[in-house]
Amino acid sequence: DSTRVYVCGMSMGGYGTMDVAGKYPDRITAAVAICGGGNSSYARNLSTLPLWIQHGNKDRAVPSSESTKIYNAIKKEDPTADVTLTIIKGGTHGSVERLFHQRKMYDWMFSYQKK
């Protein structure tokens, strides 16, 4: 179903999520990037699709500033972009893996469908 193509990933997969969504925003319905970051050159493209960025503030493998940086770049391109940044207080790189087991993330993603 080409109207329901979602991408999500954590750590290097979070970077990959931003990369795929940034390169092919016309093919992606919504994306979730956890503990990753992104290339600000994709900010314009990323601003065109629903994106939820999540990161723990105690992550020592990938600093949460990586997520904040791409979030700010997207909002600079389009202040009305449907992008959310959630910084998880006390979250470490491994502890936020639990997000993949929470229905809230999937309910959010699956609420979107391309027209």
Give the label of every model feature segment.
Residues 1, 39-45, 77, 114-115:
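Surface-exposed acidic, glycine-flexible loop patches that form ligand/cofactor-binding
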Residues 54, 60, 64-115:
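C-terminal catalytic histidine-bearing segment of alpha/beta-hydrolase fold enzymes
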